[in-house]
């Protein structure tokens, strides 16, 4: 494919229109200039032609990204770089033209930030490889990958495929556009900030070199962006692969392997893309399930949404719970979790009963509502005057009867187990 005249494809009306729609669809925060995505249409109407001419003449100058720190679950922070909405638009236009070119080069076992690929496919491929006898895992952690990409190495790799100097020029400008941290400018000597529309593609271009090296060595691997695992047949092989691949990453790609987090382990000790793994002795094969840390994160969010002191209606809480449940089940549907779903359904119903009980407030109101729900008068009176031991009351049989699964379902609550059974691909 001729890649010597790509800028005109990037600046074509059809490509720019698609880029605009995608940026607006993605929404996102404003960059250093304060222009919101809702103002992009008006901004392009005034400045669109000028931007195109600047790109053709290599005079377009991207603005610095705005640094945003996102806390990580295990401590520390993840640095995001928020470009201006105009730069997101230009980056998206570039990515749309470059992506089909590089898709032909990318490895089949690379799943992150690629069209029609997802984390679930990566997990299924990993399971298939494990069940072929590759039961030792080399889990390689790249230390601050997006912040440490070597610009010269990346541009050399891009230059092997892209022959349009205008495109090469603008990509490098984005890499060195700088960072604004609390109104102070800082040069971006290395890295491709997470948050830009072009960054995922650039990350895959760099790490495709790792994929090619692993393929050349005949290794079974799965990679999702910078999360990579290699599966081999013995502990000795795994340790050798860890040494050799770590050396390649650091010496050839100029990246840093975090040796404190990288490890050689069996599938049972692995956490990958939120999933854990276990050996099913009945089926005689490895299977995936939500990792304990993913479950803990779900429980924490569920508790936040059913907090009794949260001053919103119970119907709103149910709506937010449904969003959480559907999203979680949709992501983990390839895992085994029937028992977990049953337990979580029971917890959610109990938490909602506590919210409803508190909302009823007075003993007389509680008596009246329990009677309406079919509880006899004496039991309703005894239950209502139990005091403020809400957790104790809401676990009693009378409350399970009065506010049962069917009634909560009629109120709109989605069942985790039912949702999982409908979507599960391994049931």
At which residue positions do the language-model features occur?
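Electropositive, glycine- and tryptophan-enriched low-complexity nucleic-acid-binding patches
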Residues: 91-92, 96-109
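Conserved polymerase palm-domain catalytic core
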Residues: 47, 54-69, 73, 108-117, ...
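A conserved non-catalytic segment of reverse transcriptases
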Residues: 176, 252-326
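Extended C-terminal regions of large enzymes
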Residues: 360-427
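Non-catalytic, peripheral interaction segments enriched in hydrophobic/basic residues
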Residues: 317-363, 367, 371
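Non-catalytic, polymerase-adjacent accessory regions of viral genome-replication enzymes
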Residues: 1-45, 49
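Conserved phosphate/pyrophosphate-binding and hydrolysis machinery centered on Walker-type P-loop NTPases
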Residues: 9, 30-41, 83, 112, ...
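Short acidic (Asp/Glu) and glycine-rich catalytic loops that position anionic groups and cofactors
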Residues: 26-33, 73, 102-106, 135-136, ...
């Amino acid at each position: 494919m001729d890649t010597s005249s790509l800028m005109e494809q990037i600046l074509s009306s059809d490509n720019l229109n698609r880029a605009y729609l995608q940026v607006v669809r993605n929404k996102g925060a404003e960059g250093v200039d304060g222009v919101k995505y809702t103002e992009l249409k008006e901004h392009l109407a005034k400045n669109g032609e000028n931007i195109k001419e600047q790109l053709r003449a290599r005079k377009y100058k991207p603005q610095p990204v705005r640094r945003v720190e996102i806390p990580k679950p295990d401590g520390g922070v993840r640095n995001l770089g928020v470009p201006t909405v105009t730069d997101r638009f230009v980056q998206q236009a570039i990515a749309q033209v470059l992506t089909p070119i590089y898709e032909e080069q990318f490895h089949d076992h690379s799943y992150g930030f690629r069209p029609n690929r997802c984390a679930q496919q990566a997990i299924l491929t990993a399971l298939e490889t494990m069940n072929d006898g590759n039961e030792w895992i080399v889990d390689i952690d790249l230390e601050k990958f997006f912040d440490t990409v070597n610009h010269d190495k990346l541009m050399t790799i891009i230059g092997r495929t892209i022959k349009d100097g205008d495109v090469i020029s603008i990509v490098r400008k984005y890499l060195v556009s700088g960072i604004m941290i609390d109104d102070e400018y800082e040069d971006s000597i290395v890295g491709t900030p997470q948050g830009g529309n072009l960054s995922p593609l650039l990350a895959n271009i760099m790490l495709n070199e790792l994929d090619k090296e692993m393929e050349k060595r005949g290794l079974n691997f799965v990679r999702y962006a910078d999360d990579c695992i290699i599966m081999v047949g013995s502990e000795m092989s795994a340790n050798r692969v860890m040494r050799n691949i770590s050396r390649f990453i650091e010496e050839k790609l100029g990246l840093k392997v975090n040796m404190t987090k990288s490890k050689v382990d069996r599938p049972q000790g692995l956490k990958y893309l939120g999933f854990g793994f276990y050996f099913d002795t009945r089926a005689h094969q490895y299977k995936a399930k939500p990792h304990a840390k993913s479950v803990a994160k779900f429980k924490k969010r569920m508790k936040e949404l059913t907090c009794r002191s949260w001053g919103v209606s119970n119907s709103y809480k149910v709506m937010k719970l449904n969003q959480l449940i559907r999203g979680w089940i949709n992501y983990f549907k390839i895992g085994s979790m029937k028992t977990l779903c049953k337990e979580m359904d029971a917890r959610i119903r109990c938490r909602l009963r506590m919210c409803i009980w508190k909302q009823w407030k007075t003993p007389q109101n509680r008596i009246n509502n329990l009677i309406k729900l079919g509880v006899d008068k004496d039991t309703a009176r005894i239950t209502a005057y139990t005091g403020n031991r809400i957790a104790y009351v809401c676990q009693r049989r009378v409350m399970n009867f009065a506010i049962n699964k069917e009634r909560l379902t009629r109120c709109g609550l989605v069942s985790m187990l039912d949702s999982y059974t409908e979507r599960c691909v391994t049931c």
